[in-house]
Amino acid sequence: MSTGSSPFVDHKSNNSTISINNNSSILNESSISKAYVSKLEFQLDTIKTENRILQQEKDQITSDYRKIIDEKNQELENLKLNFKYVYDEKNQLESKLTNQEQVSTNNINQLSDEIQTYKRENLKLTKDYNSLLDKFNKLNRKNQQIMHDLNKEIEVNDKLHQELKIKEKTNQELQKASDTAINELEQYSKILDKKNGSDNLLYKNLTTKSNNLQNINHQLQNKIDQLLQNKTSNELLKQQNQSLLHKLQNLENIESKYLQLEIEKLQLETKYNDLFKALDTAIASSNEYKDNENTDDTIHTSKVKSFIEYCNNLQAKNLTLQEKYDSKIIQVKELTKELEDHAREIETDFLPTITDLESKLKVYADQNTKLERTKSLREKEITFLRNSLKQMEQIHANQQHKQQEQEKEENTENKSISQYMTNLEKLVDEYKTKIDELEKKNLEYNKSSIITNEKTPSNKRQRLESNYTFKTQAIELEKENIEISSKLKQAESTIEQLKFKISELDKVETRKEQYRILQLKNNLISQDQFIKQTTLIALRKENEELINKYIKNLPIEEQIPKGVFQRQEDDKQRLQAQIDHLTKRSTRLREVFTKKSKDIITVIAKYFGFIIEFLPNPINPTDLFSRIKLRSRYIPSEEDCYLIIDVENRGLKAHGNFQFKQICEELAQYWVNENNQFPCLLSAVNLKLYEIYASK
């Protein structure tokens, strides 16, 4: 058998492969067609379902629209039914509108009449208000005068108290001196009993003088009692002064209430002006409504109703305001009555006491002059007595010499002389003890002069030992005491002056230290260095924190530096320092401004003749330059006459008596209305016032 392949066999195999391929392609096409058919069927089903849904939606929409059409048809039928009713109502409203227009015109006329009456009442009230203002100003002036008089009386009372203390001290000293003189006179009277007829005459004179001195002492005691009574009366007057001060405080509270009433009055005036404007606009709008009656009836009726309501509200408000105003007038009348009562009380209770005090002061002054005269007379009498005592001592010395010559002849007389000498020695010892007591008292009273007083008794004793009499020593002691007291007073005055100078130096040093501290604080270089140093410290801390966070590999949220906050704080501190510096500068500028403004006002008053004062606006208290008060230098302070210039309203008002107002009106008519020269008006007013008050 051969191994080669036959061609027939090969042909069969090729045909089989072709058939298989054809079958596979047919199968693929059939599957694709089936898939396509299935897709089409699915699409058909979806389209059917969508069509069904759309049909349902269509049915629902048609049903809804049918319902809406039915409802609209019903509404149309209802509107057709209501149209006749509306037409009838329209006719009725038109008739009502005409009636209401007539009523509104009548109401407007009534309101205009009421407005005129209110204006008249307002004018009357303004007149009453001005009269009350004048009364209030008069009462204020009276109160100021009374306060001034009370202060003067208090000062006079204090001076009288001081003078009473001084007089009491002098009276005590005079009593002590008179007691010592009486004791001396009694002792000398014992000695003079043993003398001759010539000595008896001197003794009688001395006794009469001593009796006169005793009478004078009794008179002084009576005067001291009177002064004590006056002291008690002065204390009572002080209590009355305190009660008056309480009453004045109450008057200040009343003044504050009065200012509040003035502010309320101005507010009411503004409200009245607004109401008048509203009425004018309402009347104008009502005229416009009459022109446009046919255009818009419903708007016209609503506006008429609103206007009527507005008028009713206005009437109610006017009634409430009138009640409030009446209550305020009653309060003002009560306050004026209280002020008048206080003024009457002051005039009835305190003016007679003041006159009594003035008369008592005059009496006290006369008494003081009389006391000084009696004091001088007593001093002269004391000197005369001292001289007479010296003469008596000389006579006694001559008699002693005569007795020594007659000792040899009369031994009996020697015994009497020896007794007399022993009595004199005893008197000298008693005087020495009294001198020691007086010296001790002077030492206790004047501690600063201990050394000088310790030296004086030794000198006095030496003088006693060196043939000086007791009376000369007493006179020298009194002179030395007077000199020492004068030196002490001088030393005390110098000490007070030195203390005052030391206190002033301390104040100056404290001010210098404060100024240095302020300079150090406000030094710009030091502030700049301090700010730079703080910023450097903050930047260093920030860099250190950033380096540490970078090394530690912390998350981003924790890597935000805290130095930024510190830098902001430093910026805040710097801004606060700038703010403080600016506030200090502003306060200094204000102080300088006030000083300069005062200087300018004084210069204007000196060279232009008017004292300027800026008054605050009662509506806006912060506005301090809208009103200027001008007071002439030639008007006395007793008369309250001045001019007020209103800068905003360009007005000028004269306040004061009738003569001043008449002068201002005449000069304003000539210089302002005719010549339009306001500065000439001011100079003419000054000249006229100078002519009037210079002639007086």
Swiss-Prot record:
Residues 1-22, 394-415 are annotated as: Disordered. Keywords: Cell cycle, Cell division, Mitosis, Nucleus. GO terms for cellular component: kinetochore; mitotic spindle; nuclear envelope. InterPro entries: Mad1. Residues 402-413 have a biased composition (Basic and acidic residues). One of its GO terms (biological process) is attachment of mitotic spindle microtubules to kinetochore. The keyword Nucleus applies. It is found in: Nucleus. Belongs to the MAD1 family. Central component of the spindle assembly checkpoint which is a feedback control that prevents cells with incompletely assembled spindles from leaving mitosis. This is Spindle assembly checkpoint component MAD1. It comes from Candida albicans (strain SC5314 / ATCC MYA-2876).
